[in-house]
Amino acid sequence: MIKEYYGAETFILNKDFAYILVIGTTDVSLIPGLTIAGATPELTHFTPAADAEYVLLGKCKSINTIPVSPTGIPTPALLTRASLSFINPLKIVVNAGSRILPKIPYIDLQGEPGKDIRKQALSMEKVNNIIENSIKLGEELSNEYELIMIGESIPAGTTTAMATLLALGYDAMDKVSSASPDNPKELKRKVVEEALRNLPTDSLQRLAKVSDPVLLGVAGTSLGFKGKILLAGGTQMTAAAAIINEFDKNKLKDITIGTTKWIVEDKFADMLSLAKQVGVKVLASMLDLSISAYEGIRAYEKGYVKEGVGAGGSAIMALVRGVSNNTLVRKIDELYGELVGSNNLHI
């Protein structure tokens, strides 16, 4: 089942599409207690590369296991790979600025890893590189596809998303989600408030100060693409949509955010109000993982992880094409079981 918000419609998704995964890092993820998108703050810089490797290969090369939370909850890349296995679209990894580079083929936007937003996230040179090169990528994809789905992997991305939304004038304080069931709102607020001090007046310079490479890469690819776009992600994609809207007021009519029920039902965030403010449509997968054989998968139903790597959008694409909830969960369990059996995961 898929829920539709703000005029979103699923029929536009019934065509061939390419899956684009934009990866990057931000030094904000090194702040202790801010994100659980990695077993330790230091390992969060390996998460995007490992996510990309797993989606393409079914195994990781940059680290010897798939990314997990400190309590062992697996990356949403598992859900993405399971969903896409029923469709087998073209998959493209785009490096917007990852500290660790994936050991697979990828497109490089000539960006840089995001630094601490309390000081300066990105140089203007790299911001321009990311936007210009991703626009070109979107234009090229338009030659082959009428629909693309864009996912993201960047630990601490909800914090940079909140800073970005606020910098662009939206009411976003405390409204973004977290990979943890215990959203560290006070810490996020403190980091973001410090980042927003002495903001420049120019929009692009504001983004260079407080944003991250992934948001810019997602926005640029969308700006360059001529067809329909499913932004596969949670509250981060509302920030990407806000950037898109900053540069092209007509673009959002072709864009829908595709996410999970765990995001839209998150009591500690308000993704739908953010989407409404920005003016972007939303679809949410009602995928139910409570029937999984594995505790690590069932943990998603308790508010862990929630979204990432295009998990919600990928599930929507599978469900739209007739894959049942039970079939999809069986596939997720099968892939998870392979990882457990090969000692590539400890539960």
From Swiss-Prot:
It comes from Saccharolobus islandicus (strain L.S.2.15 / Lassen #1) (Sulfolobus islandicus). NCBIfam families: nicotinate mononucleotide-dependent phosphoribosyltransferase CobT, PRK04447.1-1, PRK04447.1-3, PRK04447.1-5. Belongs to the UPF0284 family. One of its GO terms (molecular function) is nicotinate-nucleotide-dimethylbenzimidazole phosphoribosyltransferase activity. Disulfide bonds: none annotated. It comes from the Archaea. Coiled coil: none annotated. This is UPF0284 protein LS215_0030.
